[in-house]
Amino acid sequence: MNVSVVILAAGAGTRMKSHIPKVLHKICGKEMLFYSIDEALKISDDVHIVLFHQENVIKERLLCAYKQAYADGALHFHLQDHAHYPGTGGALMQGQNAGANAKKPFCYQYDEILILNGDMPLVCSQTLKSLCQNKAQIVMSVLHLQNPDGYGRVVMESGVVQRIIEQKDAKESELLIKDVNAGVYKIHKSILDLYLPQVGNANNQQEFYLTDVVFYAKENGIEIAALEVKEEEFMGVNSKIQLACAQEIMLQRLREKAMEQGVIMNLPHTIYLESNVTFSGECIIEQGVQILGDSHISDSHIKAHSVIEQSIIESSDVGPLAHIRPKSHIKNTHIGNFVETKSSTLRGVKVGHLSYLGDCEIDEGSNIGAGVITCNYDGKAKHKTTIGKSVFVGSDVQLIAPLNIESNVLIGAGSTITKDIEYGDLALSRVAQQNIKDGFFKFFSDKNEEKKEQ
């Protein structure tokens, strides 16, 4: 679309009570601001982010995540002159460094300007598109709420916006109004050019309000179109409570999307998914499962209370109570309860229970017994274990990396393996067992004598 998008992300977010910038708090594994940017980039190739508080931290994160969009000129950054021009209107002004143009808007590629907030992670591009398709010179989003506390009130007559009043400046009678400003606008560039420089800060907060642009336009006979929107989409996140509420809504969206793609979910409200998780084929996800990061699950069964982090699971069953940690690739494999993997590739393997497999590669047909551990860390560095095809590793075996175990190898239970094993070998590493005649009676007889002496 031929529209420029401005995302306001300059606020301090003090109600979050956190050293982390408000817009970088995560919802389903993704920064709040990233949701707004992603939806904006779906409809525009000219997106502007206005920053101030902790702007270096936010900008660094954005440049890392949106390197290509920035290189292509689709993403731009502006630093608000907060000292001289605070507020939502001030966020659109060039600031004191621009001299005579201090209160003029920034330069945009298109005539239609869509303005939204960086703390609205639930807004959808389709709704933004609806705002932009309205031909009015000013279109604003309006919510009808039973409890409008915290929002600016919208005074309307016959469906037409008359003015907007910030809550802190509202009279008692105006606080009863249920129509509120959802905070997203589409404004023609000519309106901003004309009325933004007229905005002052003679209000209780001594801030420059974007809503005053709407007021001046209305005073000069320009009709303000209102688009009623859903509260769920336009919910602002200003506190940890609102953050949790937004995450619940996002989680439900992610679950429904997965189920629409054919995923079976047992007790879906107990399942946690992050935003970059993908599925393909027929999958079953049981209750209490967490799937995090850029994980991909294909034709697999993830059993109850398992955790999958940043990994690929293909044609496998995992769990219950398994932990697949980052950089694991599990294919055609059975992983049972209390098995943990990390940075490992398993192809056609059986790992029944109670094992840790880190920094290893195991080939098809191999069986890993209970209690097997790859000892991959020597206190200074990680080392790799490689296990070939059709290897049988007995229970309670410690594999001291670096280690190469070739195919068709048998390792006896209880062994500590420190050397490579060649094709077809049997490896044993145990202290010889001794059975001491009547040792039980002698041991406890000595204990009883000690008690008598005391």
Swiss-Prot record:
Which cellular components does GO assign to this protein?
cytoplasm; membrane
Listed under GO biological process in this entry are:
cell morphogenesis; cell wall organization; lipid A biosynthetic process; peptidoglycan biosynthetic process; regulation of cell shape; UDP-N-acetylglucosamine biosynthetic process
Listed GO MF terms: glucosamine-1-phosphate N-acetyltransferase activity; magnesium ion binding; UDP-N-acetylglucosamine diphosphorylase activity
Q: Does the keyword Acyltransferase apply?
A: yes
Which keywords fit this entry according to its UniProt record?
A: Acyltransferase, Cell shape, Cell wall biogenesis/degradation, Cytoplasm, Magnesium, Metal-binding, Multifunctional enzyme, Nucleotidyltransferase, Peptidoglycan synthesis, Repeat, Transferase
Q: Which reaction does it catalyse?
A: alpha-D-glucosamine 1-phosphate + acetyl-CoA = N-acetyl-alpha-D-glucosamine 1-phosphate + CoA + H(+); N-acetyl-alpha-D-glucosamine 1-phosphate + UTP + H(+) = UDP-N-acetyl-alpha-D-glucosamine + diphosphate
Which SUPFAM superfamilies does this entry report, sorted A to Z?
Nucleotide-diphospho-sugar transferases, Trimeric LpxA-like enzymes
- Name its co-factor(s): Mg(2+)
Per UniProt, subcellular location reads as: Cytoplasm
Q: Which residues form the active site?
A: 353 (proton acceptor)
What InterPro entries does the record point to?
Bifunctional_GlmU, GlmU-like, GlmU_C_LbH, Hexapep_transf_CS, MobA-like_NTP_Trfase, Nucleotide-diphossugar_trans, Trimer_LpxA-like_sf
Positions binding acetyl-CoA in this chain are: 370, 376-377, 395, 413, 430
- Give me the residues that bind UDP-N-acetyl-alpha-D-glucosamine, please: 8-11, 22, 87-88, 152, 166, 181, 238, 325, 342, 356, 367
**Keyword Nucleotidyltransferase included in the entry's annotation:** yes
Q: What does this protein do?
A: Catalyzes the last two sequential reactions in the de novo biosynthetic pathway for UDP-N-acetylglucosamine (UDP-GlcNAc). The C-terminal domain catalyzes the transfer of acetyl group from acetyl coenzyme A to glucosamine-1-phosphate (GlcN-1-P) to produce N-acetylglucosamine-1-phosphate (GlcNAc-1-P), which is converted into UDP-GlcNAc by the transfer of uridine 5-monophosphate (from uridine 5-triphosphate), a reaction catalyzed by the N-terminal domain.
Q: What is this protein called?
A: Bifunctional protein GlmU
